[in-house]
Amino acid sequence: MKSWKITPLGSGGLLLIEPPVYQDERGEFFESWNERVFAGLGIPVRFVQDNQSLSLRRGTLRGIHFQTGEFAQAKLIRCTSGAIQDAAVDLRKTSPDYLRVFTVDLSAENARMLFIPRGFGHGFLTLADQTIVQYKADAFYEPGSEGSIRWDDPTLGINWKLPQGMTPILSQKDAAAPYCYGA
């Protein structure tokens, strides 16, 4: 029996998760969520909301988003169509990884997932047209506690995989996000 592969990123609970994928002549099968398995892997989380985004064009950038206080969210991110460069930023001021950025490529083909604990900001850049991202959250969306950081914040220095000279496709809200200035 195949096993789940878990790779810690940094010191704060951020995890790259690779589920066992079973393939045969029909295609493939894998579990993207199993509460017992995740608890056994040291990820005891209860998700309350599932979200999905469709980005029509390569170069679409969403984020960096987060929620604060009692509405902070842990998330499980996966890409079900296309591909993304996923970015998580540790925003916990007491963390040794404070303001450290972690990026991973997630795609429908590699079936990898990223578990992001509470206290992180999150964003992603689409690397293909028609990209679908699904994510689970352990707290409901609460507009009054949401925050964002500008995608090109120099303090974070995220090395987005944008082709030379390409400007990302942004929502008005993300384009107007503030810089963190070293928070």
Model regions and ranges:
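Non-catalytic, conserved peripheral segments adjacent to functional cores
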Residues: 1-110, 128-130, 137-183
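Short beta-strand His + acidic residue motifs that chelate non-heme Fe in jelly-roll/DSBH
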Residues: 114, 122-127
